[in-house]
A protein has these predicted regions:
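Patatin-like phospholipase
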Residues: 22-62, 70-324
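Bacterial N-terminal signal peptides
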Residues: 10-20
Length: 324
């Protein structure tokens, strides 16, 4: 009888400890915004969070943020991601450059025209965009395989990848299936990369409609959302393109359409709203960087900018953890 009471008492104590642990630890979500090569700054933020012992429970990412966030969700450390940014031949990967044609000024093979190995025109497709992104997708798939996380279901941290459906003019959040294909879709800048066909959808860069997906991370269950914003130009509410008037985002896929989108930015209201809703807003200072600033020296500089920005917000994060 005494033994039975002791056993029940032990179980109750264990349950109490578990409940206390769950109550003490608010769920932390990490949002990786889009910004091309500037994504290196997000690695700098991760370095600071790791050093501070911050446990991330949910991740949402757009464009380059989907790559950094997805790989972190798979178990890659900030140090490993730093090495990736500083050593990968990003230009060749992203452009599907054919090394065998790198010395050829002009060559056409199977309807695709190459200039010094870079694809510039595809006569076989009626969708604007030349690069397939196959090289970078294969690299990402290999990196995910190393961690045993090729599918969303096997990731170490729950992850949502933001894309945009060019036919329906709708944001599409992917959280199941192939992680590398979702990443490839999320980074497919219209007019440069071909859209990714997934089920009955044609998907492009999620930054078209949601470049800082704080709302997505919140819906995943995050109590505290840390957002990393790579946008450098000050954005203000303005007259926008009414997406409901477009038959699809495909209407924006010509050169003129891309310029119109850049001018009107149909995602601005959502971006500003998400920025305000972030509990911790980290904004690396990258005045001389742009989406194409790849390379070892640029990566090192942007990573350091991420470190500086994250350290500035650490006290705010500590206060948020106490308040929750």
């Amino acid at each position: 009888m005494v033994s039975e009471r002791n056993r029940l008492f032990t179980i109750l104590i264990a349950l109490f400890i578990v409940c206390e642990a769950m109550a003490v630890h608010p769920k932390i979500g990490l949002v990786f915004g889009g910004g091309g090569a500037k994504g290196a700054a997000e690695v700098g933020v991760l370095k600071v969070l790791e050093e501070a012992g911050v446990q991330v429970d949910y991740i949402a990412g757009t464009s380059i943020g989907s790559i950094v966030g997805g790989l972190y969700a798979a178990g890659y450390t900030a140090k490993e991601l730093e090495t990736m940014f500083q050593t990968q031949e990003w230009l060749s990967l992203l452009t599907d450059r054919k090394a065998s044609l790198s010395n050829e000024p002009y060559q056409t093979i199977d309807g695709v025209t190459y200039i010094f190995g870079f694809p510039v025109m595809d006569r076989n497709s009626n969708i604007f965009g030349v690069m397939k992104g196959e090289s970078v997708e294969q690299m990402l798939d290999s990196m995910l395989s190393v961690k045993g996380c090729k599918n969303f279901e096997s990731l170490q941290i729950p992850f949502s990848c933001v894309t945009a459906d060019i036919r329906a003019a709708q944001e599409v959040v992917i959280s199941k299936g192939s992680v590398s294909k979702a990443m490839r879709a999320s980074m497919s800048i219209p007019g440069i990369f071909k859209p990714v066909k997934l089920d009955d959808r044609l998907l492009v860069d999620g930054g078209m409609l949601n470049n800082l997906p704080v709302d997505v991370c919140r819906k995943m269950g995050a109590d505290i959302v840390i957002a990393i914003d790579l946008q450098q130009n000050e954005q203000k509410p303005r007259k926008q393109t009414d997406l409901s008037m477009l038959s699809s985002l495909a209407d924006l896929l010509g050169f003129g359409g891309i310029l119109e989108w850049v001018t009107n930015r149909p995602d601005i209201e959502k971006y500003l709203e998400n920025r305000q809703k972030a509990d911790i807003y980290i904004h690396p200072n990258l005045p001389d960087a742009d989406a194409s600033s790849f390379g070892n020296k640029n990566a090192a500089r942007m990573i350091q900018a991420g470190v500086v920005a994250a350290k500035q917000q650490l006290p705010e994060l500590q206060r948020a953890l106490i308040d929750k």
